[in-house]
């Protein structure tokens, strides 16, 4: 006696929230017919900490340690967008040296984030070895962060009007040495993985998103660029000093999991190119705008007197009044467009701070991609989107 697969009721399986391939506390409720996925529902909120509400009774300086807990693998980007918002709102100019230092830190953070995406993604689909390799390069990046900021993760390095401290003596040479070491390693990963027939069977044509779908779903970052859309906020919004550097947007046209992998590999190479240029062009001068701490106290330029000069070396005051305006600021994070919508009301606290996390928006398309695929493909699709639950649940 044989029963057709269509006659069997779907089996409902819960993947997560503590599944080894879930990339955090995400839960998928999956309806299966044999090995085929019939339906899928995402259950979020296991890591919700009320980050937007916390911001409403913290000054920007007090809130900076909180933002590193959104995307805790690329913390420089959350810091960058958090200080960029008040800077744009109050029209604070940052010194050129500070801008270059920020770009260097952001690109190092991008490489570290992509490396820690690459290892687990390959481990999920059966290639265990690169998972152990990527920690070599990531460790070197964290050593550079530790030398410059004092922290390996959760750096708390960016400030309104600049950065917290200048680069230490010898740091630039160390960073150039890292660039020289890292580039051949990225090519090594490509040789190990890209042409591997088992890897290609697992990723080619899996999780296909066409160009129009990617735009309609509001995707950003590698997920959008892998579908043939050349959209990178570093080119479009002209923030920091990216315009002064010579680099290209990395993109692919296929729109599948393989294309998303290739975009991230190419982005790591491009980040090293940006790093080398920024380190070479790094100007002298101050690393922080000390006028920034006198934000909105008077509309015209403040007269310096003898009393003020004794405080000239102090860091930006935590009581920066935000003008009664609203502003949306975004940066190109490793996972996509990370944005903040900030509303000031002439007080030291923001009236509202809305976070636009890339992972949360990119996660919307996952149920559509999974339907009709095999159970084993769920891990591939979810891994290729690259999500961090800290920023999804906030």
UniProtKB/Swiss-Prot annotation:
PANTHER family: NADH DEHYDROGENASE [UBIQUINONE] IRON-SULFUR PROTEIN 2, MITOCHONDRIAL, NADH-UBIQUINONE OXIDOREDUCTASE 49 KDA SUBUNIT. Its EC number is 7.1.1.-. Its main location: plastid. NDH shuttles electrons from NAD(P)H:plastoquinone, via FMN and iron-sulfur (Fe-S) centers, to quinones in the photosynthetic chain and possibly in a chloroplast respiratory chain. The immediate electron acceptor for the enzyme in this species is believed to be plastoquinone. Couples the redox reaction to proton translocation, and thus conserves the redox energy in a proton gradient. It comes from Adiantum capillus-veneris. It is a peripheral membrane protein. It holds the Pfam family Complex1_49kDa. PROSITE patterns: COMPLEX1_49K. The keyword NADP applies. It is found in: Plastid, Chloroplast thylakoid membrane. NDH is composed of at least 16 different subunits, 5 of which are encoded in the nucleus. GO terms for biological process: photosynthesis, light reaction. It catalyses: a plastoquinone + NADH + (n+1) H(+)(in) = a plastoquinol + NAD(+) + n H(+)(out); a plastoquinone + NADPH + (n+1) H(+)(in) = a plastoquinol + NADP(+) + n H(+)(out). HAMAP family: NDH1_NuoD. GO terms for cellular component: chloroplast thylakoid membrane. Belongs to the complex I 49 kDa subunit family. The gene is ndhH. This is NAD(P)H-quinone oxidoreductase subunit H, chloroplastic. GO terms for molecular function: NAD binding; oxidoreductase activity, acting on NAD(P)H, quinone or similar compound as acceptor; quinone binding. Keywords: Chloroplast, Membrane, NAD, NADP, Plastid, Plastoquinone, Quinone, Thylakoid, Translocase, Transport.
């Amino acid at each position: 006696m044989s029963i057709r697969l269509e006659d069997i009721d779907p089996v409902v399986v819960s993947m997560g929230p503590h599944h080894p391939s879930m990339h955090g506390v995400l839960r998928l409720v999956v309806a299966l017919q044999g090995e085929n996925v019939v339906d899928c529902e995402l259950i979020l909120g296991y890591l919700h900490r009320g980050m937007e509400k916390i911001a409403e009774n913290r000054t920007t300086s007090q809130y900076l340690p909180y933002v590193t807990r959104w995307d805790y693998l690329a913390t420089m980007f959350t810091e960058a967008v958090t200080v960029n918002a008040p800077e744009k709102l109050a029209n604070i100019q940052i010194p050129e040296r500070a801008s270059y230092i920020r770009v260097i830190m952001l690109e190092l953070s991008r490489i570290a984030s992509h490396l820690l995406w690459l290892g687990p993604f390959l481990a999920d689909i059966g290639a265990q070895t690169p998972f152990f390799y990527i920690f070599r390069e990531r460790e070197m990046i964290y050593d550079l962060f530790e030398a410059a900021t004092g922290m390996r993760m959760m750096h708390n390095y960016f400030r309104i009007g600049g950065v917290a401290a200048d680069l230490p003596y010898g740091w630039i040479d160390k960073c150039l040495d890292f660039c020289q070491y890292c580039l051949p390693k990225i090519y090594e990963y490509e040789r190990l993985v890209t042409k591997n027939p088992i890897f290609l069977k697992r990723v080619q044509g899996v999780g296909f998103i066409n160009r129009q779908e990617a735009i309609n779903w509001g995707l950003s970052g590698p997920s959008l660029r892998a579908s043939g859309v050349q959209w990178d906020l570093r080119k479009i919004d002209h923030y920091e000093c990216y315009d002064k550097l010579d680099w290209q947007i990395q993109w692919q046209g296929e729109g599948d999991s393989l294309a998303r992998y290739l975009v991230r590999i190419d982005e790591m190479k491009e980040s090293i190119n940006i790093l080398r240029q920024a380190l070479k062009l790094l100007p002298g001068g101050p690393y922080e705008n000390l006028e920034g701490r006198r934000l909105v106290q008077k509309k015209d330029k403040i007269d310096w007197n003898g009393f003020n000069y004794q405080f000239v070396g102090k860091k930006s005051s935590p009581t920066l009044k935000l003008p009664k305006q609203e502003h949306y600021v975004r940066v190109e994070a490793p996972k996509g467009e990370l944005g903040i919508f900030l509303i000031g009301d002439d007080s030291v606290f923001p009236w509202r701070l809305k976070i636009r996390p890339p992972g949360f928006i990119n996660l919307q398309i996952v149920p559509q991609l999974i339907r009709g695929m095999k159970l084993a493909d769920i891990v591939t699709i979810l891994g290729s989107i690259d999500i961090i639950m800290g920023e999804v649940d906030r």
